[in-house]
Amino acid sequence: MFQSTEIGIDLGTANILVYSKNKGIILNEPSVVAVDTTTKAVLAIGADAKNMIGKTPGKIVAVRPMKDGVIADYDMTTDLLKHIMKKAAKSIGMSFRKPNVVVCTPSGSTAVERRAISDAVKNCGAKNVHLIEEPVAAAIGADLPVDEPVANVVVDIGGGTTEVAIISFGGVVSCHSIRIGGDQLDEDIVSFVRKKYNLLIGERTAEQVKMEIGHALIEHIPEAMEIRGRDLVTGLPKTIMLQSNEIQDAMRESLLHILEAIRATLEDCPPELSGDIVDRGVILTGGGALLNGIKEWLTEEIVVPVHVAQNPLESVAIGTGRSLEVIDKLQKAIK
């Protein structure tokens, strides 16, 4: 009997992950393409392209073809997907032809944005393409019983978006999607350092600062970190010391928007499911779940237990792949 290869793709703003039914996560590559602006030629894709960010001549730019979880540049996304599918085939150890693919999309994406993702994946050789809402994929990947009539609350803080959803009986009961995620927190840090210290730093440095001394809006033991950048006054390299308290303040507004989305979703919850939320709590997934103190801060703010998924960075990809096994129970969430 003929059996197609089945894979799940987490088409993230920051990273693309591929899940194979038999091997689990087989690929995790940055969603970055390096392009020569004069010839429009693609020079590098994925990890190689990310390593070029901020280090290339003026005519070579490293761009992210995905923005806020949806396609910003169709042609480049197709190039990126072709590269990913080729590498995935090698990882599986066979040249798969016409695989069945499930791709996650932000729950707030438009019909046009979803169609663009579906078409791009089909153009890369997929036989069938199913789209699953990101929070549902995250819930499946976090081992929540999404097909049972109990409330599962997922907060997926990705690179481009934060998705908050209450899932019950295979569908989304209440959901809020905001285009704020890890990338925005990085931008907040870049902007703060530029305004306060007249220092220009790159997004990779900002990400490092966020991961090392970034904290959610909760009391913590102060930390410091030395960073280097370009002095905007002299144009020369300069080293400064950043304090964790000022980085916390830089990210404050974006973190409050995330909290607002969580509160709005919980307020929309039907009364019958509210008891489940108090008992079961909220699950955090995505890279943002790794921010220092975010679990404790959210628990304090929403007065509901908050837990971090076992593999927050991979939950969406795992759930996207696993959803093929329960596709008939998830008709509301899979299109």
Curated annotation (Swiss-Prot):
Q: What induces it?
A: Expression is sigma I-dependent.
List localization entries. Answer: Cytoplasm; Membrane raft
Look up the coiled coil feature and give its residue ranges.
none
Binding-site residues, ATP: T13, A14, N15, G159, G160, T161, E207, Q208, V209, K210, G287, G288, A289, L290
The chain's disulfide connectivity reads: none
Q: Which GO terms describe its molecular function?
A: ATP binding
Q: Which UniProt keywords apply?
A: ATP-binding, Cell shape, Cytoplasm, Membrane, Nucleotide-binding
Q: Which domain of life is it from?
A: Bacteria
Q: Which GO terms describe its biological process?
A: cell morphogenesis; regulation of cell shape
Q: Which GO terms describe its cellular component?
A: cytoplasm; membrane raft
User: What extra comment accompanies this record?
Assistant: B.subtilis has three MreB paralogs: MreB, Mbl and MreBH. All paralogs have the ability to support rod-shaped cell growth normal conditions. The multiplicity of paralogs becomes important under stress conditions. They are probably used to allow cells to maintain proper growth and morphogenesis under changing conditions.
Q: Family per UniProt?
A: Belongs to the FtsA/MreB family.
Q: Describe the function of this protein.
A: Forms membrane-associated dynamic filaments that are essential for cell shape determination. Acts by regulating cell wall synthesis and cell elongation, and thus cell shape. A feedback loop between cell geometry and MreBH localization may maintain elongated cell shape by targeting cell wall growth to regions of negative cell wall curvature. Filaments rotate around the cell circumference in concert with the cell wall synthesis enzymes. The process is driven by the cell wall synthesis machinery and does not depend on MreBH polymerization.
Q: Tell me how this protein assembles.
A: Forms polymers. Forms a complex with Mbl and MreB. Interacts with the C-terminal catalytic domain of LytE.
In its UniProt entry, what is this protein called?
Answer: Cell shape-determining protein MreBH
Tell me the gene name: mreBH
